[in-house]
């Protein structure tokens, strides 16, 4: 069984601010678990889309019942692929863990789309959780992962809002 999760978040600002914040979101006070982020590749394709691949290293706290399977490892590598279409004010992102996939594989697909009617940017996310365990512990691992993901999404949105605010303050300094 694979566990699916969907969420929507509205950023009350323009697409340029949201996409700029996405690429500058680390570090922020809500993401101390992000240890490093490296850009692997970045280019503009023939259609004018900005394509970026980044590698992130994250740490995390695990429940005691999972620790024996990971032998004390509390860090993971994440691949992040993004495509920004400036002409349509859209950005599509895909992230997934590169290690521990036999225990849990988490894949996130997010589309950021500017809505001119509300002057806001809407982020629609779909997440797929799949565990390599047998039925007994499989649902427990997937449920824990989804719950943890929900907590992290809230922090991620607060982190993005923090970065958007800081970028706005830098753009319009108060005297």
UniProtKB/Swiss-Prot annotation:
Changing residue 23 to D: Strongly impairs interaction with MDM35. Failure to complement the mitochondrial defects of UPS1-deficient cells. Residues 2-172 form the PRELI/MSF1 domain. GO terms for molecular function: lipid binding; phosphatidic acid transfer activity. Changing residue 54 to E: Decreases phosphatidic acid transfer activity and impairs cardiolipin biosynthesis. InterPro entries: PRELI/MSF1_dom (IPR006797), Slowmo/Ups (IPR037365). The keyword Nucleus does not apply. It holds the Pfam family PRELI. Changing residue 58 to E: Failure to complement the mitochondrial defects of UPS1-deficient cells. It is a peripheral membrane protein. GO terms for cellular component: mitochondrial inner membrane; mitochondrial intermembrane space; mitochondrion. PANTHER family: MSF1/PX19 RELATED (PTHR11158). Interacts with MDM35. Found associated with a 170 kDa complex. Present with 704 molecules/cell in log phase SD medium. This is Protein UPS1, mitochondrial. It comes from Saccharomyces cerevisiae (strain ATCC 204508 / S288c).
